[in-house]
């Protein structure tokens, strides 16, 4: 494994364990040249799944695109990279278990919102505003009132 700091080819594995979602092996490595440590993940082959978009287009499922959307929603919030990774891992595992070749972007969005709602309300609202295509303040207000009515207005 090549060191991301000095590009040296020789590294050693210090620790190896199963990820929280149990779909990857997390390895802590140390470069034998510069001594710096870094983490790698070993995952099974990517999920071969098509996402049906709102406009009728189909595109391959992309966990990195999902992760990027979560990172934007969670920016400057108390949500760690590990928590974002766990959400992505959980959603990918749930989609894999369905054993279907196609899923709607709406279904994926609903899965994300369900998890963000339990994690961070500001991130939830940010994601919902894009996913549900809010165009004015009244739509935000309605969502906030709905959340407050369900006792879920705390977070962030």
Curated annotation (Swiss-Prot):
CC cofactor note: Binds 1 zinc ion.
Protein origin, superkingdom: Bacteria
Domain ATP-cone: 49-139
Keywords noted in UniProt: ATP-binding, DNA-binding, Metal-binding, Nucleotide-binding, Repressor, Transcription, Transcription regulation, Zinc, Zinc-finger
Cofactor(s), names only, from the UniProt record: Zn(2+)
Zinc finger (unnamed): 3-34
Keyword check for Cytoplasm: no
GO terms of biological process kind: negative regulation of DNA-templated transcription
PROSITE patterns, sorted: ATP_CONE (PS51161)
MF term (GO), any: zinc ion binding
UniProt record similarity statement: Belongs to the NrdR family.
Chain's role: Negatively regulates transcription of bacterial ribonucleotide reductase nrd genes and operons by binding to NrdR-boxes.
PANTHER family: TRANSCRIPTIONAL REPRESSOR NRDR
Protein name: Transcriptional repressor NrdR
Species in which this protein is naturally found: Rubrobacter xylanophilus (strain DSM 9941 / JCM 11954 / NBRC 16129 / PRD-1)
